[in-house]
């Protein structure tokens, strides 16, 4: 194999391996971005986060409804017999007078009356009314509304946290799929080289230049590479299945590797930024605000509750409905908890502890995110150094293989030495693809640590 051909192959491999990291921010792969947007729309885990957000929105509407009038229909009917009574001696009081009047008038206009015994339990009595209630002063429901409004912001931050984690996972899976695909290509190239060696060794054996040892060794190497290809193809399938899983689509769907992003031979420097805009910190800030509102809500027992009500209905015996049975009733209710054996105070103290606890969690998270960013940047610099080393190693391995190949074809080199050079070249190509993917993964980790991807 000529030096010119090998150089062209090396150039093609390098061009395929190098990623346009310089275009990471403003000119990122449209194909990869399209995949990310598709995941935003289809990923099941993200859908669950949106369901929780929708639930919080409805919870806020529920809290708002507590400030509006509540109308309910209430009805009851009683049938009673026996029990306590009120005895009214109407006959004893009026009958003597009625008898005297009948004698004076010589008539019976005034009948004799019986004493009455009235049941205290109403018999055959109904009461149906519409009750309208309206809170006038109630600090608890006021705080409940503010808490649920903050909870919406908390859930929205949770959605963004999941999105950023999903972006990193998708990019990492994309690079792993790329790396697995390159491994298949590299092993296929190695197989072609071994097949060429078999052809040359067969020719040498036919011409009596060498014995069958080199040919046997070449065939054994071919079987080893075939096994490596099988393993690499399996890793590629698994990487593709995981990538499709993140996008919530058929696990065997094809994956496009945008060729326009394999143009640059330069690795860009790591982006700079801070982690003070991390949505996790926004979540903790909202949780702290909710805890503070909960504390204030627990202290709201000091303010009395005041509400009003209006009843419009009808009540009478024997299901009578007329102008006499219809009625209305309006009133004002006052509730003021004056003593509860310290329950409210202890509840307020628990809420105060929650506020302090969340503040401590915020401080810890802020420091941990700084550590995460520093670690990601250190990993990036290490990955870049490894990439540069792998790049240099590939160039040296390529030159070494070309030199050994020439000497072998001239019959001045053992096949085992040529095979060693070929394996070094294959390993160098694999190492470069691994190092390249590690650089891109490190960049994705920095992007995640800085929360810099535009959602």
Could you describe each region identified by the protein language model?
Residues 3, 34, 58-60, 157-277, ...:
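Periplasmic alpha-helical coiled-coil/stalk elements that build and connect Gram-negative outer-membrane
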Residues 48-63, 162, 168-185, 203, ...:
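Amphipathic alpha-helical coiled-coil segments
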């Amino acid at each position: 194999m000529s030096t010119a051909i090998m150089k062209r192959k090396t150039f093609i491999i390098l061009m395929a391996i190098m990623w346009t990291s310089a275009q990471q921010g403003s000119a990122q792969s449209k194909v990869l971005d399209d995949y990310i947007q598709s995941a935003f729309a289809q990923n099941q885990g993200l859908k669950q986060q949106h369901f929780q957000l929708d639930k919080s929105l409805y919870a806020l509407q529920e809290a708002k409804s507590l400030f509006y009038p509540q109308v309910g229909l209430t009805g009851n009917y009683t049938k009673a017999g026996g029990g306590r009574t009120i005895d009214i001696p109407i006959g004893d009081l009026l009958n003597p007078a009625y008898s005297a009047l009948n004698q004076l008038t010589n008539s019976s206009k005034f009948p004799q009356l019986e004493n009455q015994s009235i049941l205290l339990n109403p018999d055959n009595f109904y009461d149906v009314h519409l009750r309208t209630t309206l809170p006038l002063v109630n600090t608890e429901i006021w705080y409940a509304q503010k808490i649920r409004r903050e909870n919406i912001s908390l859930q929205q931050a949770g959605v963004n946290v999941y999105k950023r984690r999903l972006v990193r996972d998708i990019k990492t899976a994309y690079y792993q799929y790329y790396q697995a695909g390159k491994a298949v290509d590299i092993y296929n190239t190695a197989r072609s080289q071994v097949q060429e060696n078999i052809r040359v060794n067969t020719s040498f054996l036919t011409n009596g230049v060498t014995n069958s040892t080199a040919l046997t060794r070449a065939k054994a190497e071919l079987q080893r590479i075939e096994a490596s290809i099988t393993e690499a193809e399996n890793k590629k399938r698994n990487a593709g299945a995981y990538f499709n899983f993140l996008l919530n689509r058929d696990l065997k769907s094809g994956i496009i590797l945008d060729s326009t992003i394999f143009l640059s031979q330069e690795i860009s420097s790591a982006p700079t930024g801070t982690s003070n805009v991390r949505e996790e910190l926004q979540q903790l800030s909202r949780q702290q605000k909710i805890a503070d509102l909960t504390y204030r809500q627990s202290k709201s027992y000091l303010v009395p509750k005041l509400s009003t009500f209006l009843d419009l209905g009808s009540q009478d015996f024997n299901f009578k409905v007329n102008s006499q049975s219809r009625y209305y009733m309006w009133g004002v209710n006052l509730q003021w908890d004056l003593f509860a054996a310290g329950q409210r105070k202890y509840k307020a103290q628990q809420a105060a502890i929650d506020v302090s606890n969340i503040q401590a969690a915020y401080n810890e998270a802020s420091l941990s995110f700084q550590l995460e960013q520093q670690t990601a940047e250190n990993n990036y610099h290490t990955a870049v150094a490894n990439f540069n080393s792998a790049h240099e190693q590939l160039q040296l391995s390529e030159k070494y293989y070309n030199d050994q190949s020439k000497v072998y074809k001239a019959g001045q080199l053992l096949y085992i030495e040529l095979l060693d050079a070929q394996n070094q070249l294959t390993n160098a190509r694999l190492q470069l693809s691994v190092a390249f993917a590690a650089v891109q993964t490190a960049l994705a980790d920095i992007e995640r640590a800085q929360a810099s991807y535009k959602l």
